[in-house]
Design a protein with these regions (language model features):
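N-terminal beta1-alpha1 ligand-phosphate binding loop
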Residues: 1-24
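Short glycine-rich anion-binding loops that position phosphate/pyrophosphate groups of nucleotides
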Residues: 3-4, 70-73, 101-104
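Short, surface-exposed alpha-helical segments at coil->helix boundaries
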Residues: 10-18, 50-54, 107-110
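Conserved strand-to-helix beginnings and helix N-cap segments that scaffold or border functional pockets
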Residues: 10-13, 77-81, 110, 130
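Catalytic-core regions built around general acid/base machinery
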Residues: 16-19, 83-90, 112
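S-adenosyl-L-methionine/SAH cofactor-binding core of RNA-modifying enzymes
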Residues: 25-95
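Structured adenosyl-cofactor binding patch, chiefly the S-adenosyl-L-methionine
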Residues: 103, 107-156
Length: 157
């Protein structure tokens, strides 16, 4: 929910989007589409969240739903990659990643989600979260592909 304005954040997200596109094709996954939904204009927070949830669920359809919310789990990059691999192997190649608006997410989204991911308890701007999601998707795909981008577990001491 929300739009990413032009600038360095949009450029960073676009760079990762292009990388993800190439990896998706190589791994037999659906490509990456970015859908920006406007924030609801409802007066009450609960009404805004409910309207936004309805629009997001309609867009997600039958896709795997990954919701990014502070109430979620904080999986390792390897665990996130394994979930994506499992979904692909189950024939579920479409993954919808949802980042909420400034009012947060309606509980219906978390209930419907196949995975709720948290980047921690910190509050972050939407554009930063979008860049983190794009990078983690790329990282997960490189882990699945055995690409050297991800170098976890190395001790430089």
């Amino acid at each position: 929910v929300g739009r990413l304005k032009s600038g360095p954040e949009r450029e960073l997200v676009e760079r990762y989007r292009q990388r993800v596109e190439g990896m998706c094709r190589a791994l037999g996954l659906a490509g990456l589409d970015t859908v920006e939904l406007p924030e609801s204009r409802a007066r009450r927070d609960d009404d805004r969240r409910a309207e936004e949830a309805a629009a997001l669920l309609e867009k997600a359809g039958a896709s795997v739903l990954v919701v990014f919310d502070e109430r979620g789990k904080s999986p390792s990059s390897e665990a996130f990659a394994e979930k994506i691999r499992q979904w692909r192997d189950e024939g579920r190649s479409g993954i919808a990643c949802v980042i909420g608006g400034p009012d947060g997410l309606d509980p219906k989204l978390r209930q419907r989600a196949d995975l709720v991911v948290s980047f921690g308890a910190l509050t972050m701007p939407h554009q930063i979260v979008r860049a983190l999601v794009a990078e983690q998707l790329y990282r997960a795909l490189t882990i699945i592909a055995g690409h050297p981008y991800h170098r976890a577990g190395h001790d430089d001491s």
